[in-house]
Amino acid sequence: MSGKVVSSIREAIEAAGLHDGMTVSFHHHLRSGDYVINMVMDEIAAMGIKNITLNASSLFDTHAALVQHIKSGVITGIITDYMSAGLGKYISAGVLERPVKFMTHGGRPAAIMDGRTPVDVAFVAAPAADKDGSCTGKTGRSACGSLGYAFADAEYAKKTVVITDGLCEKLEQPSIDGKFVDFVVEVPEIGDPKGIVSGTTTI
């Protein structure tokens, strides 16, 4: 299987040309079960890249591990719609180099689309994806439903990387078309299904 598939997150980061001072983005459809934000930011840190703006549609307690990357100067700015206490209490002490920019769930994609908050590399966690980058959240062992919060990221970022634990040859009904995707990475797990249904999504 080839297509747009690369061997690792590091290879995707290198191929996307990520360097100091750029902006990376993520969606929050995996909610408290998300592994991808920490996974990618750990790799960015290991590569020695710094002064990154993190644009994420929401951040949960599972992302409290990002504190280490704020302390080390890997993350110097955050744009988000929501932040839970795990990360929020730390940031409220004024440790981030630049103030957090909070946006609404509609305002964030609008700002990406009109260029107010441009994204250099979007990392899209996808429960199912094919080798050409088409992906969906409706199927796969980590299924989360809609990938709507990632639409603007995928379409308007300079480079888009899909990260999946459900790689297939051809996806018949994608939510995001592969024409917007530059690279695909398969990982063992993108998240914990038990945490995907949490908080306001619990019935």
Predicted features along the sequence, with ranges:
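Conserved alpha/beta enzyme-core scaffold
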Residues: 1-203
